[in-house]
Design a protein with these regions (language model features):
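C-terminal regulatory/effector modules of DNA-binding transcriptional regulators
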Residues: 77-179
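Long amphipathic alpha-helical segments
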Residues: 1-102
Length: 179
């Protein structure tokens, strides 16, 4: 399908405005991190929430931000304190949006998702977001958090028939731990 010539400049302007908005938000969030400025983070986040869903903000802004922060951290441009500061503010937003969903009963009851990180695993931001997405889709979730002893998961089998365990590892578990 051809686009009318008069629509092309409008489309170009929309694309430029969207990229500019994302770039501005990313820069504001990086500045908030560098200055440990929670207020700037919250103002930037609230401004984004006026235009986008939480899922859009996470995918379009937070993920690129975290990718960039990873590079900054690996090159010693930022300290672990900077990374922890911004990660905890993002976690706070995930918790808030997840809690809003938890007031409603799950609509999909055929599966229960149990989310956990194994012992010595502390990087939970991604798992928290998966928990949010599963709850958003109407599933019952049980979030167990970080450094969960794997042998303790067997208890859950007494309570639910169709459990899906969700985890990931950035530390290397032994084969015996996985079995």
């Amino acid at each position: 399908a051809k686009m009318g010539e008069e629509k092309i400049p409008v489309l170009v302007n929309e694309i430029i405005a969207e990229k500019s908005e994302k770039s501005h938000a990313l820069n504001s969030l990086k500045l908030a991190m560098l200055n440990f400025d929670q207020s700037l983070f919250l103002r930037t986040y609230n401004s984004l929430m006026e235009e986008k869903s939480f899922t859009q903000i996470f995918n379009e802004v937070f993920i690129p931000l975290l990718n960039e922060l990873g590079l900054l951290w690996q090159t010693n441009t930022i300290s672990p304190a900077h990374e922890h500061f911004i990660s905890n503010l993002i976690k706070q937003k995930i918790y808030i949006h997840t809690e809003k969903l938890q007031f409603e009963a799950p609509t999909k009851k055929d599966e229960v998702f149990v989310l956990f990180l194994p012992e010595n695993e502390i990087h939970e931001l991604g798992l928290l977001y998966i928990n949010y997405q599963l709850a958003l889709q109407g599933y019952k979730t049980i979030y167990l958090g970080r450094t969960m002893p794997i042998e303790s998961l067997e208890d859950l089998l007494k309570y639910y028939n169709n459990i899906r365990f969700v985890s990931y590892f950035t530390v290397a578990p032994t084969k015996d731990e996985i079995d």
